[in-house]
């Protein structure tokens, strides 16, 4: 699926995620805009899962607990599939920003 087709589904994913946050959480959340990433499609023989993602513009990729990480652009990569990565961060409780419960990244695979 190309970038245009994936981005057309952004509003559907956004609406679903906002509904989920309103319906199933009791805390206030800052919901960040979704962005497209290319996730590695691992073969069974792969011992390690290489992260086939677009280059982040800051110190770490979005699969870490660094809430400031995000992508500058996307690119196609043959063994990878496009996914929309949605980030939301709990803004009420005061604990370390790198705490896993304050950073949730959910990939949505458009190839299925």
Swiss-Prot record:
Q: Where is this region: Disordered?
A: 93-112
Extract the Pfam families matched here: DUF468
Give the matching InterPro entries: DUF468
* Disulphides: none
Q: Which domain of life is it from?
A: Eukaryota
Please state which protein family the record places this protein in. Answer: Belongs to the UPF0320 family.
Miscellaneous notes: Contained within a telomeric X element core sequence.
Question: Under what name is this protein listed?
Answer: Putative UPF0320 protein YEL074W
Q: Which organism is it from?
A: Saccharomyces cerevisiae (strain ATCC 204508 / S288c) (Baker's yeast)
